[in-house]
Amino acid sequence: TKKSILGDFTSLHMVVPTLRCNSSCIYCQVARKNRDDHSADMTKQTAKNIVKTIFQSPSPCIKIEFQGGDPSTDFEMVKYIIEEAEWQNLFKKKALDFVICTNLTLLSEKMVQYLKKHNCMISTSLDGPKDLHDINRPLQDKKLDHHAIFESHLSMIRKIWGNNDCASALMTTSKYSLGRFKDIIDEYIRLGFKSIFLRSLNPYGFAKQYKEKIAYPIE
Protein backbone atom coordinates (compact mmCIF):
# COMPACT_ATOMS: atom_id res chain seq x y z
CA THR A 1 0.00 0.00 0.00
CA LYS A 2 1.01 3.61 -0.40
CA LYS A 3 1.31 3.99 3.37
CA SER A 4 3.43 0.91 4.00
CA ILE A 5 6.60 3.03 4.05
CA LEU A 6 5.38 4.66 7.28
CA GLY A 7 6.09 1.45 9.19
CA ASP A 8 9.79 2.12 8.71
CA PHE A 9 9.56 5.87 8.92
CA THR A 10 12.77 7.76 9.57
CA SER A 11 14.86 6.30 12.36
CA LEU A 12 17.70 8.87 12.27
CA HIS A 13 17.06 12.13 14.09
CA MET A 14 19.72 14.85 14.13
CA VAL A 15 19.64 17.11 17.16
CA VAL A 16 21.66 20.32 17.53
CA PRO A 17 21.99 21.17 21.26
CA THR A 18 24.10 24.25 20.50
CA LEU A 19 25.88 26.08 17.70
CA ARG A 20 28.89 26.75 19.91
CA CYS A 21 32.23 25.38 18.72
CA ASN A 22 35.93 25.75 19.45
CA SER A 23 36.98 25.13 15.84
CA SER A 24 37.17 27.43 12.82
CA CYS A 25 36.81 24.88 10.03
CA ILE A 26 37.26 26.56 6.66
CA TYR A 27 34.26 24.74 5.20
CA CYS A 28 31.86 24.93 8.17
CA GLN A 29 28.30 24.72 6.88
CA VAL A 30 26.56 26.28 9.89
CA ALA A 31 26.55 29.69 11.55
CA ARG A 32 28.79 28.52 14.37
CA LYS A 33 29.09 30.53 17.57
CA ASN A 34 32.10 31.11 19.76
CA ARG A 35 32.49 28.81 22.73
CA ASP A 36 31.33 31.46 25.21
CA ASP A 37 28.30 32.58 23.15
CA HIS A 38 25.19 30.91 24.61
CA SER A 39 22.70 32.66 22.33
CA ALA A 40 22.07 29.52 20.26
CA ASP A 41 21.91 26.96 23.09
CA MET A 42 18.86 24.70 23.25
CA THR A 43 16.58 25.02 26.27
CA LYS A 44 15.49 22.02 28.33
CA GLN A 45 11.86 22.56 27.34
CA THR A 46 12.77 22.53 23.66
CA ALA A 47 14.88 19.41 24.18
CA LYS A 48 12.02 17.67 25.97
CA ASN A 49 9.61 18.53 23.15
CA ILE A 50 12.09 17.26 20.55
CA VAL A 51 12.51 13.92 22.29
CA LYS A 52 8.74 13.57 22.61
CA THR A 53 8.35 14.25 18.88
CA ILE A 54 11.12 11.80 17.97
CA PHE A 55 9.34 8.99 19.78
CA GLN A 56 6.18 9.64 17.78
CA SER A 57 7.96 8.00 14.84
CA PRO A 58 6.47 4.56 14.09
CA SER A 59 9.92 3.18 13.33
CA PRO A 60 11.01 0.38 15.71
CA CYS A 61 14.51 1.87 15.71
CA ILE A 62 15.54 5.33 16.87
CA LYS A 63 18.98 6.84 16.46
CA ILE A 64 19.64 10.30 17.89
CA GLU A 65 22.70 11.98 16.41
CA PHE A 66 24.06 15.06 18.17
CA GLN A 67 25.45 17.69 15.83
CA GLY A 68 26.44 21.31 16.15
CA GLY A 69 28.48 23.41 16.48
CA ASP A 70 30.27 20.89 18.63
CA PRO A 71 27.83 19.23 21.05
CA SER A 72 30.58 18.75 23.62
CA THR A 73 30.48 22.51 24.27
CA ASP A 74 27.09 21.91 25.94
CA PHE A 75 27.57 18.41 27.28
CA GLU A 76 24.99 18.91 30.02
CA MET A 77 22.32 19.28 27.34
CA VAL A 78 23.60 16.16 25.57
CA LYS A 79 23.22 14.27 28.85
CA TYR A 80 19.74 15.70 29.41
CA ILE A 81 18.56 14.54 25.97
CA ILE A 82 20.10 11.08 26.35
CA GLU A 83 18.45 10.54 29.72
CA GLU A 84 15.12 11.96 28.56
CA ALA A 85 15.19 9.62 25.55
CA GLU A 86 16.05 6.64 27.74
CA TRP A 87 13.14 7.53 30.03
CA GLN A 88 10.73 7.77 27.08
CA ASN A 89 12.02 4.45 25.79
CA LEU A 90 11.08 2.66 29.01
CA PHE A 91 7.54 2.92 27.65
CA LYS A 92 8.17 2.84 23.88
CA LYS A 93 10.53 -0.17 23.91
CA LYS A 94 12.38 0.79 20.71
CA ALA A 95 15.93 -0.03 19.66
CA LEU A 96 17.59 3.20 20.81
CA ASP A 97 21.05 4.38 19.76
CA PHE A 98 23.04 7.58 20.16
CA VAL A 99 25.90 9.18 18.22
CA ILE A 100 27.78 12.37 19.05
CA CYS A 101 29.59 14.26 16.28
CA THR A 102 32.59 16.02 17.79
CA ASN A 103 36.13 17.14 17.04
CA LEU A 104 37.17 15.26 20.23
CA THR A 105 39.24 18.13 21.61
CA LEU A 106 36.90 19.05 24.49
CA LEU A 107 36.08 15.50 25.59
CA SER A 108 37.29 14.64 29.08
CA GLU A 109 37.68 11.16 30.55
CA LYS A 110 34.50 11.74 32.58
CA MET A 111 32.56 12.66 29.43
CA VAL A 112 33.82 9.58 27.58
CA GLN A 113 32.93 7.32 30.51
CA TYR A 114 29.40 8.75 30.38
CA LEU A 115 29.17 8.15 26.62
CA LYS A 116 30.33 4.57 27.07
CA LYS A 117 27.84 3.95 29.88
CA HIS A 118 25.00 5.13 27.66
CA ASN A 119 26.36 3.45 24.53
CA CYS A 120 26.71 6.73 22.65
CA MET A 121 29.09 6.16 19.75
CA ILE A 122 31.49 8.87 18.61
CA SER A 123 31.72 10.28 15.11
CA THR A 124 34.58 12.62 14.36
CA SER A 125 36.45 14.27 11.51
CA LEU A 126 39.98 13.58 10.36
CA ASP A 127 41.03 15.34 7.18
CA GLY A 128 44.44 13.70 6.90
CA PRO A 129 47.94 14.16 8.29
CA LYS A 130 48.72 17.05 10.62
CA ASP A 131 49.44 19.75 8.03
CA LEU A 132 46.25 19.06 6.07
CA HIS A 133 44.01 18.53 9.10
CA ASP A 134 45.18 21.75 10.73
CA ILE A 135 44.69 23.77 7.51
CA ASN A 136 41.13 22.55 7.06
CA ARG A 137 40.15 22.41 10.73
CA PRO A 138 42.08 24.98 12.81
CA LEU A 139 41.03 25.59 16.39
CA GLN A 140 39.91 29.07 17.37
CA ASP A 141 42.75 29.18 19.88
CA LYS A 142 45.67 29.33 17.46
CA LYS A 143 48.13 28.33 20.20
CA LEU A 144 46.60 24.84 20.33
CA ASP A 145 47.65 21.98 18.07
CA HIS A 146 44.39 20.45 16.82
CA HIS A 147 45.88 17.29 15.34
CA ALA A 148 48.00 16.55 18.42
CA ILE A 149 45.00 16.97 20.76
CA PHE A 150 42.87 14.86 18.41
CA GLU A 151 45.39 12.01 18.47
CA SER A 152 45.82 12.16 22.24
CA HIS A 153 42.07 12.19 22.93
CA LEU A 154 41.42 9.43 20.40
CA SER A 155 43.85 7.23 22.31
CA MET A 156 42.14 8.11 25.60
CA ILE A 157 38.69 7.31 24.18
CA ARG A 158 39.76 3.92 22.86
CA LYS A 159 41.44 3.05 26.14
CA ILE A 160 38.25 3.79 28.09
CA TRP A 161 36.03 1.89 25.66
CA GLY A 162 38.48 -0.97 25.30
CA ASN A 163 38.25 -1.08 21.51
CA ASN A 164 38.86 0.96 18.36
CA ASP A 165 35.32 0.68 17.01
CA CYS A 166 33.77 3.23 19.39
CA ALA A 167 34.89 6.14 17.19
CA SER A 168 34.54 6.49 13.43
CA ALA A 169 35.83 9.30 11.25
CA LEU A 170 35.08 11.08 8.00
CA MET A 171 37.18 13.44 5.93
CA THR A 172 35.92 16.50 4.11
CA THR A 173 37.60 17.19 0.78
CA SER A 174 38.86 20.72 0.24
CA LYS A 175 41.11 21.95 -2.55
CA TYR A 176 44.05 21.25 -0.24
CA SER A 177 43.08 17.55 -0.15
CA LEU A 178 43.44 17.01 -3.88
CA GLY A 179 46.50 14.94 -4.73
CA ARG A 180 46.90 13.92 -1.07
CA PHE A 181 44.65 10.87 -0.94
CA LYS A 182 47.44 8.37 -0.27
CA ASP A 183 48.63 10.56 2.61
CA ILE A 184 45.08 10.74 3.95
CA ILE A 185 44.51 6.99 3.80
CA ASP A 186 47.92 6.32 5.34
CA GLU A 187 46.99 8.59 8.26
CA TYR A 188 43.74 6.72 8.81
CA ILE A 189 45.66 3.45 8.85
CA ARG A 190 48.30 4.86 11.21
CA LEU A 191 45.61 5.94 13.67
CA GLY A 192 43.86 2.58 13.59
CA PHE A 193 40.70 3.45 11.66
CA LYS A 194 39.22 0.55 9.69
CA SER A 195 37.18 2.68 7.29
CA ILE A 196 37.04 6.14 5.79
CA PHE A 197 34.03 8.15 4.63
CA LEU A 198 34.81 10.75 1.97
CA ARG A 199 32.68 13.87 2.05
CA SER A 200 32.61 16.59 -0.59
CA LEU A 201 32.13 20.27 0.18
CA ASN A 202 28.60 21.55 0.62
CA PRO A 203 28.01 24.80 -1.30
CA TYR A 204 26.81 26.87 1.64
CA GLY A 205 28.04 28.36 4.88
CA PHE A 206 31.74 29.16 5.07
CA ALA A 207 32.45 26.83 2.13
CA LYS A 208 30.45 29.17 -0.09
CA GLN A 209 31.99 32.27 1.46
CA TYR A 210 35.54 31.01 0.84
CA LYS A 211 34.87 29.07 -2.36
CA GLU A 212 37.67 30.81 -4.28
CA LYS A 213 40.13 29.51 -1.70
CA ILE A 214 38.92 25.96 -1.03
CA ALA A 215 36.50 24.85 -3.78
CA TYR A 216 37.18 22.65 -6.82
CA PRO A 217 35.35 21.75 -10.05
CA ILE A 218 32.76 18.96 -9.84
CA GLU A 219 34.67 17.07 -12.52
Language model segments and positions:
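Glycine-enriched alpha-helix->loop->beta-strand junction motifs that scaffold or abut catalytic
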Residues: K116-I122, G192-K194
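Radical SAM enzyme [4Fe-4S]-AdoMet core and its adjacent flexible, acidic
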Residues: D131-E151, S155, K159-E219
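A cross-family glycoside hydrolase active-site/sugar-binding cleft signature
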Residues: V16, E65-Q67, V99-N103, S123-D127, ...
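Helix N-cap and loop-to-helix transition residues
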Residues: T43, D74, S108, P129, ...
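Short, solvent-exposed loop/turn segments at secondary-structure junctions
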Residues: N22, P71, T105-L106, P129, ...
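N-terminal-biased segments
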Residues: K63-D70, G128-I135, L139
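Conserved alpha-helical substructure of the radical SAM core
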Residues: T1-Q113, K117-H118
